């Protein structure tokens, strides 16, 4: 039974990721006055299936000088972590209900750095290694602000369980009271998932393709799936943390529909940002975090600690 639950969890995520690639190409196409994919199937709807067949039937190439085991393990690890992060998310019910769900998600998003680092090092290519080092520095840096923002939210929420967050936001979404945190969280998720305008790991002009330059066929598709699964999970997290994923506790179908709609809207905003903004310079990226976001998040964290203490109020307890 657990295997069936697991499959019912994983297959829709992979399908959503596949069609997210189509949505991205269509959105970018229309924003650049092009059509996007429109040959395979009606309106290009079967393009992700054609891409999957092409990628998984090609011969997986491996550089002669690469470290074989690590080269193969890295993409598998990336996809495994990207899919595992979904398990504690209430949509509105979780696959595994964890007491420390938020810490679990934060820890796994930190682990995803290893797959990028291993792939860059095992490829034995200077471009891949530079891309991997950039990715590691960027991801670890932005995790600092993500952790502090989560701590601030937890001080309002009263526990680390994600289900408690839904109860906290029954009357009012947290984005109303914590909008500066929400803005910084959203920008940090862009950097955490290596998306434009923070896609310095795959700067085509200087790094050819970044950490995955030596990958082709199936392993490349795994990295691709992991990246888009991470984008969706980060937007799902944003919905749960700030937008209140539930509408009515008597109709759980409505809750799921509300959650999906908000997550989709945030994902489309990711694509809109990619079409609108040029890439940051690396020093600007680091200055934004260490000189802007970190001081503000620390100050806001102190503010959210002082409010319950000053007003002698406690967060909602289950």
Swiss-Prot record:
What InterPro entries does this protein's entry cite?
NADH_UbQ_OxRdtase_su1/FPO (IPR001694), NADH_UbQ_OxRdtase_su1_CS (IPR018086)
The upper taxonomy is:
Eukaryota, Metazoa, Chordata, Craniata, Vertebrata
Q: Which GO terms of the cellular component aspect does the record hold?
A: mitochondrial inner membrane
User: What's the EC number here?
Assistant: 7.1.1.2
Keyword vocabulary terms for this entry: Electron transport, Membrane, Mitochondrion, Mitochondrion inner membrane, NAD, Respiratory chain, Translocase, Transmembrane, Transmembrane helix, Transport, Ubiquinone
* One Pfam family linked to the record: NADHdh
The family this protein is said to belong to: Belongs to the complex I subunit 1 family.
Picking any one GO biological process from the record gives: aerobic respiration
Role description:
Core subunit of the mitochondrial membrane respiratory chain NADH dehydrogenase (Complex I) that is believed to belong to the minimal assembly required for catalysis. Complex I functions in the transfer of electrons from NADH to the respiratory chain. The immediate electron acceptor for the enzyme is believed to be ubiquinone.
This chain belongs to the protein called NADH-ubiquinone oxidoreductase chain 1
Q: Which gene encodes it?
A: MT-ND1
